[in-house]
Amino acid sequence: VYFLELWHGPTCAFKDYALQLMPRLLVEAKKNLGRTEKTLILVATSGDTGKAALDGYHDIPGVEIAVFYPTGGTSEIQRLQMATQEGANVAVYAVRGNFDDAQTGVKKVFGDTAIAAELAKRNIRLSSANSINWGRLVPQIVYYFAAYAQLLKAGRITFGDEVDFCVPTGNFGDILAGYYAKRMGLPVGKLVCASNENNVLTDFLTTGTYTAKREFFKTTSPSMDILVSSNLERLLYHVTGSDAEAGGLGKSLG
């Protein structure tokens, strides 16, 4: 058994690996496309994503970021990390409810054409730093390959040996990155979905039935305190091969 250390970023969250790179990719993409509008990043968080996103996007030119977290739904350290973030372009808001409520609210904003039209008048375009944004998943694929390379270098495996990965999972993004690494050719054996008391994903993968309407538990691992996992819809797409079917199934998760 080996542990992949992903806490060496500036906020000690594994999400630093994506959220330190993602803002720079955004700036370069806007430059290449000749886009001059301001980008407003909306983030729902149960703790570590919020701080990692704030740290990555603070004082990035042409970008503002607003983070929404559930009152009492993060650790006190995470709340203080977010509340004390420096930067002229950052804002943090507490919302009543849990992470799923915050995430649902952010998704509704993205789907509201009236809001999009009003923002367009103000030369503002919405984006997200959550894993609903494909740009969050791409950097996470890399460290599966890096982990495999480290095992090769240490002589623990030989090239072509399959390696199993056990991934603590809430919104299904990190483990999905492992799935994409496997599809890209990395010799991955099993991807083990590890859950806490909010084990909706474990139940789904075990029984084939997704039941989000259940008791929500606040645990000591708030980043996994999620009942509606956004990235599961992406897996459903690959299983069904249909945008429409996956979209319909995704909407039914809540």
Language model features: what each stretch is:
Residues 1-254:
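PLP-dependent amino-acid enzyme catalytic core
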